[in-house]
A protein has these predicted regions:
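Accessory terminal and edge-of-domain segments that mediate assembly/interaction
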Residues: 1-221
């Protein structure tokens, strides 16, 4: 079952019994693809282990381009209120605030309803320990790109394996101020257990679908 890697193509290795799916870009496509897979009558996935993999942005304060991060906290960067930054109070650092709150990073926030997902940290640590000494691909182009981050020592290291929080949002964002917001947002929703290390556009959609599938015993999360 292979046809060029378009969304919802399936790739199966009968020797390793690994089943792969291409979800497509964005939380909506990811949620739809994983829900379709979970409900597909050809597969019994109630005892399957799930690993989410993909390309990501990375915080230069934590790691270099080409590094790989294992995450157990995945935070949604879209579910929020937003006020135009040109109109926010002077003592606010951002116009993003949690739903049901009146100012950014209000400690009295409502219970998460899709804003944060936590995977099994023991599995994350197991995977990290298996791979932490792996030598990653490090072509000369990476060093050239990383050299621009002169104020971030970790960004100039050869690619390496680490652990850290992940933020998923539908907007492809860039910049120091948004980077600072992402760190605070992940720390806020993880209650200080993680900060932003990598960013993507799909993972909270994947987790939401798995959570719903778990309720009908199609998967075990």
């Amino acid at each position: 079952m292979q046809d060029g890697g378009k969304p919802y193509d399936l790739f199966y290795n009968p020797k390793t019994k690994v089943l792969g799916v291409v979800t497509g870009i964005g939380t909506a496509k990811a949620a739809s693809a994983i829900m379709a897979l979970g409900l597909d009558p050809r597969f019994e996935l109630s005892r399957a282990y799930w690993m989410i993999a993909g390309i990501a942005g990375i915080d230069p304060e934590n790691a270099s381009i080409g590094s790989v991060a294992w995450s157990s906290y995945v935070v949604d960067g879209d579910l929020s209120h937003q006020i135009d930054a040109r109109e926010i109070p002077e003592n606010w650092t951002t116009g993003y605030l949690a739903r049901g709150t009146k100012f950014p990073f209000d400690p009295e926030r409502p219970k998460s309803n899709g804003e944060v997902f936590k995977a099994n940290p023991n599995l994350r640590d197991w995977a990290y320990n298996l791979t932490k000494n792996v030598s990653l691909i490090n072509p000369p182009q990476l060093a050239t790109a990383s050299s621009a981050y002169t104020e971030h020592p970790n960004a100039q290291l050869p690619p390496f394996v680490l652990r850290g929080g992940h933020i998923a949002a539908m907007t492809f964002w860039h910049g120091a101020l948004l980077n600072d917001w992402a760190n605070k947002w992940v720390e806020y929703w993880s209650d200080g257990a993680a900060d932003y290390v990598t960013s993507g556009m799909e993972d909270t959609g994947t987790f939401q679908a798995l959570q719903y599938l778990d309720r009908i015993n199609k998967v075990d999360v």
